[in-house]
């Protein structure tokens, strides 16, 4: 049946840029990729995008811990994430970052429209503050007991047990995740998005019938509890986008994170030189379809805040949300100690991507059910289905076709009715792929595979091959088997991209959804090469052991500058502003008689001379080499009387000490007396 081509934009939830991709992440990206590949096979115009969620306090603090900038950390993490997704053959058209100019502009645009339309409210709130670290605590940096279901060890924004959202101040017995201290309350002005104004619109959207029943039911519970205004601002220090005309205030990561979908698509349009498509997909009256694949833990943000933000800023809402459950391994939560918290890159060191893609797909449905990766069942199912049923169908027929008929298939089908049974299944299987009933699609395909193998068993080409005068029968039987293999692989193409490539090379033709209506007759195939290898439990054992070793390595003591010399306690901006740093010219440098550590520096501050004693002699055995250099000094440090004289300041240097001391210098152009700001 001919379909009208649709314009479709598909997204996955944005992975957070402070950690590696693991098998829990991969469920969603595989699910979305299978659906996208099917849509492309049916001739639809699909844009499949994602990005790293790159803002927030966790990223800022982890970068500090690593001794690098947040920008450097998220850049490195983006490369790692993209490598992992490419390894699993996730066919993104674009992978971007929320820390981008596109996302900044769109975040400011949406915020300004919401503000102009009266949906942004200002008020002073009492907020949890870490007295030991000197910082306000983001939601995810406070833990305590859920105020709704009383589950312990829950984050400050939502409960992973009951799904409730709340303010971190509502937590019972809260603790700072940063220091372990009990937070104290401090006042701060914050900006709020007026979510209750959109209650009627959101309830109508919920009742439209597009959302999964479980999602709609959960949303109804939230409506009955009453929607609350949403705090969209955070106080400095914070890594993110500063709110326009609000110094020291930043957009909360959950405001600009979903806008990252738009930012990534805008980046893709700009790369293509296509200025039309962005509005075509995101304008209020867009006829394009927009789907978000997400986990059940972020339904609240995507089903309430996100559509309300879009509505309030005159953009289109999502067509639907496709929500999935969590991944367990061997019936339990992924565990680092048991070696079942498995990174995507670790998996690819032991198994190919198609194996996990197939196993997840075989278990997925349109419901929000958790998926268990039972590693023993995984081995058995991959071997039984992919190797024994599908690949074996090709291998047991290809040998005869290659050896006896120079790779040429028969001119007629041996069993046209059986072939029709296979092609007639396209509607049922296609509908299963379309509706995300992936497990049903796989069951239908494997039932056909059983039928195909039964046909070969009954026809027994290995027996026919030994009988004189039956060459035509042998060619017909084996050609039939290969044609049935082609249909099966066409149905499995969205799931098994690498196996599909090898199958297409053998069949000497591209596998297309509509192409199966015409069997390969009188067609020459290529010599058969092994398409897929069996897997075994030894590989699983090696995978689990490797995951355990990675955990041990990650737990090893951190080495490097920060380990030896940790960052000091946080200071306020006012504290920092008291330090007057100036550019100084070193006019003279000499040894200090009676000291094996000090150099006497004569510094020119642009009209004022200073005498400074500095403990850098071990790194600069020839003090004359410093004369003429510019450096940075603390100009308002109280003079210090020493037995060699008075030191009138301090020069800035870095390094662990000894010979490894490095005097700081400003860029060319800085002049003596210039203030460092």
From Swiss-Prot:
InterPro entries linked: aa-tRNA-synth_I_CS, Anticodon_Met, Met-tRNA-synth_bsu_C, Met-tRNA_ligase_1, Met-tRNA_synth, Methionyl/Leucyl_tRNA_Synth, MetRS_core, MetRS_Zn
Catalytic activity: tRNA(Met) + L-methionine + ATP = L-methionyl-tRNA(Met) + AMP + diphosphate
'HIGH' region (motif): residue ranges: 15-25
Coarse class of the protein's main subcellular location: cytoplasm
SUPFAM superfamilies per the UniProt record, alphabetical: Anticodon-binding domain of a subclass of class I aminoacyl-tRNA synthetases (SSF47323), Methionyl-tRNA synthetase (MetRS), Zn-domain (SSF57770), Nucleic acid-binding proteins (SSF50249), Nucleotidylyl transferase (SSF52374)
Binding positions (Zn(2+)): 146, 149, 159, 162
EC number per UniProt: 6.1.1.10
Pfam families reported in the protein's UniProt record: Anticodon_3, tRNA-synt_1g, tRNA_bind
Binding site for ATP: 336
Compartment(s) where it occurs, according to its Swiss-Prot or TrEMBL record: Cytoplasm
Enzyme class: ligase
Placement of sequence motif 'KMSKS' region: 333-337
GO biological-process terms attached to the record: methionyl-tRNA aminoacylation
Cofactor remark: Binds 1 zinc ion per subunit.
Keywords: Aminoacyl-tRNA synthetase, ATP-binding, Cytoplasm, Ligase, Metal-binding, Nucleotide-binding, Protein biosynthesis, RNA-binding, tRNA-binding, Zinc
GO cellular component entries: cytosol
GO molecular function: ATP binding; metal ion binding; methionine-tRNA ligase activity; tRNA binding
Required cofactor(s): Zn(2+)
Domain tRNA-binding: 575-677
Subunit description: Homodimer.
HAMAP family the UniProt entry points to: Met_tRNA_synth_type1
Functional summary from the UniProt entry: Is required not only for elongation of protein synthesis but also for the initiation of all mRNA translation through initiator tRNA(fMet) aminoacylation.
Sequence similarity: Belongs to the class-I aminoacyl-tRNA synthetase family. MetG type 1 subfamily.
Protein name: Methionine--tRNA ligase
Organism of provenance: Escherichia coli O9:H4 (strain HS)
């Amino acid at each position: 049946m001919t379909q009208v081509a649709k314009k479709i934009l598909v997204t996955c939830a944005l992975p957070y840029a402070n950690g590696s991709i693991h098998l829990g992440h991969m469920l969603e990206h595989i699910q979305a990729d299978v659906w996208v590949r099917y849509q492309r096979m049916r001739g639809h115009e699909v844009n499949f995008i994602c990005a790293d969620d790159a803002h927030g306090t966790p990223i800022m603090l982890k970068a500090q811990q690593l001794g690098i900038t947040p920008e450097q950390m998220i850049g490195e993490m983006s490369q790692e994430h993209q490598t992992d997704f490419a390894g699993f053959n996730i066919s993104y058209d674009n992978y971007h970052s929320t820390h981008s100019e596109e996302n900044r502009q769109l975040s400011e645009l949406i915020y300004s429209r919401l503000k102009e339309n009266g949906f942004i409210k200002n008020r002073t709130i009492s907020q949890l503050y870490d007295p030991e670290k000197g910082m306000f605590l983001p939601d995810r940096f406070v833990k305590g007991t859920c105020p709704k279901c009383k589950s312990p060890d829950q984050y400050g924004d939502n409960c992973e047990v009951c799904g409730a959202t709340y303010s971190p101040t509502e937590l019972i017995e809260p603790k700072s995740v940063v220091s372990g201290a009990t937070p104290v309350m401090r006042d701060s002005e914050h900006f709020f998005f007026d979510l209750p104004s959109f209650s009627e619109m959101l309830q109508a959207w919920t009742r439209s019938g597009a959302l999964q029943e479980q999602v709609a039911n959960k949303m109804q519970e939230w409506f009955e509890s009453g929607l609350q205004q949403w705090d969209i601002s955070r106080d400095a220090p914070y890594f993110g986008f500063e709110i326009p005309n609000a110094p020291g205030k930043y957009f909360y990561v959950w405001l600009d994170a979903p806008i990252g979908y738009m930012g990534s698509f805008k980046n893709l349009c700009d790369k293509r030189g296509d200025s039309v498509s962005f509005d075509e997909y995101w304008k209020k009256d867009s006829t394009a379809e927009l789907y978000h694949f997400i986990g059940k833990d972020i339904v609240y943000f995507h089903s309430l805040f996100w559509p309300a933000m879009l509505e309030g800023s005159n953009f289109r809402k999502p067509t639907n949300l496709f929500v999935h459950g969590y991944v367990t391994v061997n019936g339990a939560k992924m565990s680092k100690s048991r070696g079942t918290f498995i990174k995507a890159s670790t998996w690819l060191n032991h198994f190919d991507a198609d194996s996990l893609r197939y196993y997840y797909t075989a278990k997925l449905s349109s419901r929000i059910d958790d998926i268990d990766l039972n590693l023993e069942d995984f081995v058995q199912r991959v071997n039984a289905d992919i190797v024994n049923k599908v690949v074996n169908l090709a291998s047991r027929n290809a040998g005869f076709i290659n050896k006896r008929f120079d790779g040429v298939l028969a001119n007629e089908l041996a069993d046209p009715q059986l072939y029709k049974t296979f092609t007639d299944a396209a509607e049922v299987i296609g509908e299963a792929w379309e509706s995300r009933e992936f497990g049903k699609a796989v069951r239908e395909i494997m039932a056909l595979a059983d039928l195909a193998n039964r046909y070969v068993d009954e026809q027994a080409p290995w027996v026919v091959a030994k009988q004189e005068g039956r060459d035509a029968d042998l060619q017909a039987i084996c050609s039939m088997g290969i044609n049935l293999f082609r249909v099966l692989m066409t149905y499995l193409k969205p799931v098994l991209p690498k196996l599909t490539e090898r199958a297409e090379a053998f069949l000497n033709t591209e596998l297309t959804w509509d192409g199966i209506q015409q069997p390969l007759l009188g067609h020459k195939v290529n010599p058969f090469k092994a398409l897929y290898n069996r897997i075994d439990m030894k590989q699983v054992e090696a995978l689990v052991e490797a995951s355990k070793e990675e955990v041990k390595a990650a737990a090893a003591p951190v080495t490097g500058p920060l380990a030896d010399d940790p960052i000091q306690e946080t200071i306020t901006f006012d504290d920092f502003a008291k330090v007057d740093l100036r550019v100084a010219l070193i006019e003279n440098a000499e040894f200090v008689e009676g000291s094996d550590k000090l150099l006497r520096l004569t510094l020119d501050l642009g009209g004022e001379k200073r005498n400074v004693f500095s403990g850098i002699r071990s790194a600069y055995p020839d003090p004359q080499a410093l004369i003429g250099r510019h450096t940075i000094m603390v100009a308002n440090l109280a003079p210090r009387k020493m037995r060699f004289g008075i030191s009138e300041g301090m020069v800035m240097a870095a390094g662990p000490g000894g010979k490894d001391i490095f005097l700081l210098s400003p860029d060319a152009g800085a002049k003596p007396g210039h203030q460092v700001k």
